[in-house]
Amino acid sequence: MKAAKACIDLSALQHNLQRVKAQAPESKVMAVVKANGYGHGLRHVAKHANHADAFGVARIEEALQLRACGVVKPILLLEGFYSPGDLPVLVTNNIQTVVHCEEQLIALEQADLETPVVVWLKIDSGMHRLGVRPEQYDEFISRLKTCPNVAKPLRYMSHFGCADELDSSITPQQIELFMSLTSGCQGERSLAASAGLLAWPQSQLEWVRPGIIMYGVSPFSDKTAQDLGYQPVMTLKSHLIAVREVKQGESVGYGGIWTSERDTKVGVIAVGYGDGYPRSAPNGTPVWVNGRTVPIAGRVSMDMLTVDLGPDATDKVSDEAILWGKELPVEEVANHIGTIAYELVTKLTPRVEMEYTK
């Protein structure tokens, strides 16, 4: 019997992608598969996200992995290329790139490429992380349009900083700025990622870029993906390796941070921070065992965690324990831990077995 295992429901992935298409019917879909498909397995995700019109990645290595496994659809390097030496690789493998800074623009102007590269100009519409500032926009447009290494027409994109906050005044300002700058442009545009396409439909332009929602995880702090009609793709599970009697007043685990207030039974589950489950998970973080949630009791260790099963528990060694999934939303677990679900699904370690089902 394996210990921690991540079960990936590929039919749920396909359901979610179809739902994105239904919610943004006038847009083409760029499925974002960076960070190993948000921890779900890049190659499997790309193979089964076959209704996507293109793929978005963060690193050139991810793009090359997609090409190596037979993906022929467009691939966009969302952070752009890191050095001039990457440009011939983009040409050879037909990879599109974002341009967000002067250094990338100069590299394109100085390169000697066999064929032009498809470029998306990233505009800093208000997040202030990457992108061309509005006062730089005209100069960048002029230089990119006259650069022989840039395929025409030029494309345009930006990224929201607060799209998951529905009362934010920043997002409408970002939309207004982006639309005013790109009004009348011939090239295609992209503004909405997961939160944008769900909460700000006016940002659904020629392309949308679903990321976390495609994996059945909500971008919002107050809603699960299931609340929004999406299905969890990942279920992280393990099993009980011990059920122990603990007396009132006895402490459990490193540091003795949990002390039992009554005689009870404590279950030991074969999963820990060595598998990517956060050591920071506090007492009370829920785990699903035999049809109910039970609280973590004690500090998460490298290979194990402990839960309070209750004094009348009938759970047995080898019974299944679900850390998150359909029965226990990953968003709920993340809220208890004080993090976001994105972090939980992307931080599983290689020793977690990946099991794919359709």
UniProtKB/Swiss-Prot annotation:
The keyword Isomerase is assigned to this record: yes
A GO biological process held by the record: D-alanine biosynthetic process
InterPro entries recorded: Ala_racemase, Ala_racemase/Decarboxylase_C, Ala_racemase_C, Ala_racemase_N, Ala_racemase_pyridoxalP-BS, PLP-binding_barrel
Keywords: Isomerase, Pyridoxal phosphate
UniProt entry tagged with the keyword Isomerase: yes
Annotated substrate binding sites: 129, 302
Family matches, as SMART domains: Ala_racemase_C
PTM-bearing positions, type N6-(pyridoxal phosphate)lysine: 34
GO cellular component: cytosol
Cofactor(s) the protein needs: pyridoxal 5'-phosphate
SUPFAM superfamilies named among the record's database cross-references: Alanine racemase C-terminal domain-like (SSF50621), PLP-binding barrel (SSF51419)
Function: Catalyzes the interconversion of L-alanine and D-alanine. May also act on other amino acids.
PANTHER family hit by this protein: ALANINE RACEMASE, ALANINE RACEMASE, BIOSYNTHETIC
Protein name: Alanine racemase
Organism field: Vibrio parahaemolyticus serotype O3:K6 (strain RIMD 2210633)
The encoding gene: alr
